[in-house]
Amino acid sequence: MNVGKLQPVRGTRDLLPEECYKFWHIRDVAHDIGERYGFVPVETPIFEFQDVFLKTLGDSSDIIGKEMYSFPDRGGDVLVLRPELTAAVARMLICERLTLPARLFTFGPVFRYERPQKCRQRQFHQINYEHFGAGCTADAELMALAYDILGALNLRSEVQLEINSLGNQDSVLEYRNSLLKYFEKHEHALSEDSRRRLQTNPLRILDSKDRGDIAILCGAPVIADFYDDESKMTFNGVMQQLDNLGIPYTVNPRLVRGLDYYCGTVFEFKTTSLGSQDAVIAGGRYDKLVASMGGGDVPAVGFAGGVERLASLAAYSHSTRFSVAFLPLGEEAARCAMRSAYELRGRGIRVLCDGVVEKLKIGLKHADRSGVDLALILGDEEIAKGEVLCRHMDTGLQQTVSISNLGDYVSGMESNAQGNNRAALSSAGE
C-alpha cells in the first residue's frame, strides 16, 4: 500500500491518548454543567439527508456554498456528513415529537471542507446545547452556562464575551437593504468572497476577516439603528440579566453569525490566542428554524463550542488510575496471573497482564514505562508457596502477599492512593 495513503486524510488527524483524555474531560465538564441547567444528552446520526441543511443554513452560507461533504447513496438519495449540529437536533425534535420545552446536549464530530489550519480541521468536534421552546430569558441563561464551562476549564481570563442583537425580521430586512446600498458604493474594494456575499446576503460581509473589508466596515451602518421598540426592550433585558449575573460582556454592533437561521440575540466568546479562529463558543437565537423545517413555531436558543479550540487553550493533565501489572515468569504463573487479574478487575482495579515475561528485568522496565504502581511478580517459587511478590514501583520496596489475600491487599493500596490524591488536590486548592 502507498505509504502516503497511510497518513490521515488532509484536514483530519489521529488523537493520541493524552489528547483523547483532554477531549473526554471537556465533554464530561460540558455534560456535568449542562445537567445542572437541566440539559439531557441526545445523539443524531453523523450523516443526514442533504435537505436538512439546505433548507436551514441558507444559500449564502459558506457551508452550503463550498463546505458540505455530500454524496449519493445506493438508493438515489443525496446525503451529507453533518456540517453542524443544530439543524440535525431540530430535525430530531420534529421527527421524535419531543415534548417542549426541550433542553438537549450533544457532543460529537462535524465535517466541513475548509482549508485546514490551526484549530480548523475538516473533521472537528463540538459541544452543543439547544433549548427549544425557550423564551428570551433563556438567552442570558445559555451564556451563563457557557461562562460556567469556561470557568470549569479555567479559561475565563482567556476569553471575552461579545453580544449583539439582529432584532426582528423587519429590522433585519431594513438593515440588509441599507448595507446593500453602502457596500455597492465600495464594491470595487471588497474581497472576492464579499462581492459574492453582496449578491446573496450582505450581512455575511460583516463577518469578513479580510483586512480590506474590515477597513470598509468601519463606516458601515449598524443594526441597532434599525431596531423597533420591542427589539430594543428585548436586547436591553438580556443585558440587564447578564449584569445581574455578574457576567462581563461587550456589545459588538457588527457581530453576526454565519448561518441564516439566527435572529435576535447572538453571542461569541472570543480569544486573542488562536489567531483568526477566535471564537471558541458561539450561538444565539433561532426562533424560525423549526418552522422552516415544517415543525411549527418553536422559539429556540443555543450554542456550540469548538472542542479542539477549547483543548488548545485548556491546561489539563490526565490523572492515571492506580494500576498494577502482573509479571509471570512461566506458563503456570501466567495462568495464575490471568485468574488473579480477572478477580482484581472485578474489584475495579486497572490491571495489565501480557503473558509470560522472559526476563524479569525487562518486565520491570515495561511496567515502569506503563506507569503502574505495583508490579506483581509470579515465579515457580511464588506459585509453590501460593504467594505473590509485590514490588512498589516508586520506592522499589518489595513485599510478599498470599494469593488468597491479594485482592484485599491491592484494594487497600488503591484506597490509600486515592486518599493521597484527594489530600494533594485539597492542599493545592487552599
From Swiss-Prot:
Homodimer. GO terms for biological process: histidyl-tRNA aminoacylation. Gene3D superfamilies: Anticodon-binding domain (3.40.50.800), Bira Bifunctional Protein, Domain 2 (3.30.930.10). NCBIfam families: hisS. Belongs to the class-II aminoacyl-tRNA synthetase family. Coiled coil: none annotated. PANTHER family: HISTIDINE--TRNA LIGASE, MITOCHONDRIAL-RELATED, HISTIDYL-TRNA SYNTHETASE. GO terms for molecular function: ATP binding; histidine-tRNA ligase activity. It catalyses: tRNA(His) + L-histidine + ATP = L-histidyl-tRNA(His) + AMP + diphosphate + H(+). It is an enzyme of class 6 (ligase). The keyword Chaperone does not apply. Its main location: cytoplasm. InterPro entries: aa-tRNA-synth_II, aa-tRNA-synth_II/BPL/LPL, Anticodon-bd, Anticodon-bd_dom_sf, His-tRNA-ligase, HisRS-like_core, HisRS/HisZ. The gene is hisS. Keywords: Aminoacyl-tRNA synthetase, ATP-binding, Cytoplasm, Ligase, Nucleotide-binding, Protein biosynthesis. The keyword Mitochondrion does not apply. Its EC number is 6.1.1.21. It comes from the Bacteria. GO terms for cellular component: cytoplasm. This is Histidine--tRNA ligase. It is found in: Cytoplasm.
